[in-house]
Swiss-Prot record:
GO molecular function, one term: DNA ligase (NAD+) activity
Domain of life: Bacteria
Known catalytic reactions: NAD(+) + (deoxyribonucleotide)n-3'-hydroxyl + 5'-phospho-(deoxyribonucleotide)m = (deoxyribonucleotide)n+m + AMP + beta-nicotinamide D-nucleotide
SUPFAM superfamilies: BRCT domain, DNA ligase/mRNA capping enzyme, catalytic domain, Nucleic acid-binding proteins, RuvA domain 2-like
Family recorded in the similarity comment: Belongs to the NAD-dependent DNA ligase family. LigA subfamily.
Cofactor(s) of this protein: Mg(2+); Mn(2+)
Species of origin: Salmonella schwarzengrund (strain CVM19633)
CC annotations in GO: cytosol
The protein, known as: DNA ligase
Amino acid sequence: MEPIEQQLTELRTTLRHHEYLYHVMDAPEIPDAEYDRLMRELRELEAQRPDLITPDSPTQRVGAAPLTAFNQIRHEVPMLSLDNVFDEESFLAFNKRVQDRLKSTENVIWCCELKLDGLAVSILYENGVLVSAATRGDGTTGEDITSNVRTIRAIPLKLHGDNIPARLEVRGEVFLPQAGFEKINEDARRTGGKVFANPRNAAAGSLRQLDPRITAKRPLTFFCYGVGILEGGELPDTHLGRLLQFKAWGLPVSDRVTLCDSPQAVLDFYHNVEKDRPTLGFDIDGVVIKVNSLALQEQLGFVARAPRWAVAFKFPAQEQMTFVRDVEFQVGRTGAITPVARLEPVQVAGVLVSNATLHNADEIERLGLRIGDKVVIRRAGDVIPQVVNVVLSERPEETRPIVFPTHCPVCGSDVERVEGEAVTRCTGGLICGAQRKESLKHFVSRRAMDVDGMGDKIIDQLVEREYVHTPADLFRLTAGKLTGLDRMGPKSAQNVVNALEKAKATTFARFLYALGIREVGEATAAGLAAYFGTLEALQAATIDELQKVPDVGIVVATHVFNFFAEESNRDVIGQLLAEGVHWPAPVVINVQEIDSPFAGKTVVLTGSLSQMSRDDAKARLVALGAKVAGSVSKKTDLVIAGEAAGSKLTKAQELGITVIDEAEMIRLLDA
């Protein structure tokens, strides 16, 4: 066997292994970028020796064979994959190939859309009624997931409108919004269930359940992006026209679809989407660029596994492989001890990553992680990098177990893990320097007391020099004392003192959030402030009374009650008030006198809003007598669903709660 034959055999075997893990087992072991690199290497070798290309080479087919647990559906029109480009130069080369093949010097009109990171499916409608659905599988044969797809509320069981074809097969992506993914994992950690590495794995695992009742509980959604079978009807002669027609028939289509009349316009779209990526609420890994004209698509045709008229322009990889060199333990403001992996530095999504959170002891056990392991690191948007999985097939011989500390690594106090909780905590309280630092950093943060110019390094020095022990001590600082800190001149010191003085005027909700009560985030703090109105009323509340507040259950109510029952906490609050911290007296709203459909209602916002910010929407709703909650419960009267609404929308539908969209909310606000 020639050396190149050996290389080809090894590459094909490796790629088939990873295709099986990705497409069949929903448990990928390597990042997409590494798979793409291996595929490029195989293509390049096959280009050198086309006589060695085999029919079953991964370059000649799509995906992997389907699971035998599902019935199989043969695709009458193959579900092909897309070729990829990874930089501007490669895209411009693709654009030129298209123009050359069309023998045209004029710019092609491109239809650009999002490349969703979910599971490709085909859905067949006969006379407008959903009759079957299948996964991509190997592109020729997929798995019959009809029963599961019927549980996805975004997918219509019957199309509506005129001129619906007798047989119409739509293609699209089933995916899981970020909020739904976090809720699934949160529930799994609480119940000891399977924790998913990323939303794509969660979507695939949810869609390919043998029991559709499990799928029905998962907040999956769907966007349509193409067509397979078309019989007994017609569709528009452009890709965008077809998407708009699908939308008119009731099929969900992404609103981020744009026509571009030049290569530069495509690049602008790519960069704008890349910038907006962290705020979309769901995962994408690039944009898809298609020739808009169906006539030109037919003229361009296909290669073995992909169309010549479309390409996926992928973003820089958000996942990379590296090694865990050590694990250290950090202490947070509530005493939570968090293991942090120290990594061999690696570039991920344009950022050099050398640390990744490991969350807790359960996560380390779930991963089966040891120091020295080769791991996959993921960094999405502004999220702290995390270890996705261990590459067990490449585990080095010299690895060692991770041992959780029995004493606080900062103050030496005992650590404890309360039954039913995943977190291990230091019991040292404010005698622990780490907890003191983190509590003060939280207190001055932008969404809390918002002390401009007081960064982490200043807090670190103030605690280390014992200038500050409690939040009230901050307001006693003088410019003279601050000037003694590193890199703090007289002008900067005075600016910090001025910022502290300005921060004394706050709101009741911000003040509560700044106190750092366990489990009390911004939304809960706002709910407590709105419900009780005054600090005195809140401090006097019983656990039962606290649970009357939207989103406050027994756990949160107990934490709030215990916080105010602690004499040292009441003392700190008294000192803060004595130093001049204040907020406006509550405005008593008589909902009986407000003529608004929102008056007296408990309202939940979910998804992203396009017409106004979430804060503005909350403010207007509260002004009209509504109580804005952060989660859906039986107490909820109304849910307002924006784009990419996730688990909250699903729960509202399960509970039979009224749901309106953003347009209807604005109409009612302006009524």
